[in-house]
Regions:
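Basic, flexible Lys/Arg- and Gly-enriched helix-loop patches that mediate nucleic-acid binding at interfaces
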Residues: 1-238
Length: 238
């Protein structure tokens, strides 16, 4: 996942501590660290980085933002604005945010965006087993063998996918609940079994679902949803 970075002296200045020029002097004096490394003039930091001055962590004066988007087909989940149809240009949000994870260009559905680097790491860390649910339509009839094999695990990308919940919706459609996020995982799993995905929609991330968000639109998470999300990830590893 790509993240937008800013200059370290701007980050320090934005805390209200001092000017950028004064921040550079602090950096040159060896008093600033990024994570566990002594900073150097010209360094840049992302939202997941931690910055320390004389051993004390500096916190940017930024209000946390949490957005749920019903991503339309064709939008690319990257912060790289050189990429056509990137999600940042699509939202055209006034402040710096980035997506939590990805949905590939031809998929649609729920994706969260934020400026909170800590929560991004906790949700995305593979060992945290957070559920994501999808509704998938394929090109031919779904049989019992397909459902059982998908649920048990499929060899892709030099590994075997984790066991997961798979339920049939109709002749060509199924629901699947994953606790990992390999690249194009569902499409690769289906291709291994000689099925082609015709439509893929993410409908849920943990207990946050897409209900009430029209296709292509977004809303802020409610205060109760944010509190719930914090509770869900409080024991997650960063």
């Amino acid at each position: 996942m790509e993240q937008e970075h800013i200059s370290l002296n701007k980050f320090i200045s934005d805390t209200g501590l001092c000017s950028r020029r004064e921040a550079d002097k602090l950096i040159e004096a060896g008093r600033v660290m990024i994570n566990e490394t002594t900073a150097r003039k010209g360094n840049r930091v992302g939202l997941a980085d931690r910055v320390f001055l004389d051993g004390k962590e500096l916190k940017g004066q930024v209000k946390p933002i949490y957005i749920a988007l019903n991503k339309p087909i064709g939008v690319v989940c990257t912060t790289d604005q050189r990429e056509p149809d990137n999600i940042i240009d699509y939202l055209n949000y006034s402040e710096r945010i980035f997506p939590i994870g990805r949905l590939d260009k031809m998929s649609q559905g729920l994706i969260l965006l934020t400026n909170d680097g800590d929560i991004v790491n906790k949700i995305l860390r593979a060992g945290n087993y957070h559920e994501k649910e999808y509704v998938v339509t394929v090109d031919k009839s779904i049989d019992t063998s397909f459902l059982k094999t998908m649920a048990a695990g499929v060899p892709i990308l030099d590994t075997v996918t984790r066991p997961c919940k798979v339920t049939k919706v109709d002749q060509f459609t199924f629901k699947i609940v994953l606790t990992q996020g390999l690249n194009r995982q569902i499409r690769r799993m289906c291709e291994f079994l000689d099925y082609q995905v015709k439509a893929l929609t993410r409908v849920r991330i943990m207990d946050l679902n897409i209900d009430g968000i029209p296709y292509g639109e977004w809303r802020y998470l409610t205060e109760s949803e944010v509190l719930w999300l914090m509770e869900m990830v409080k024991d997650s590893r960063k």
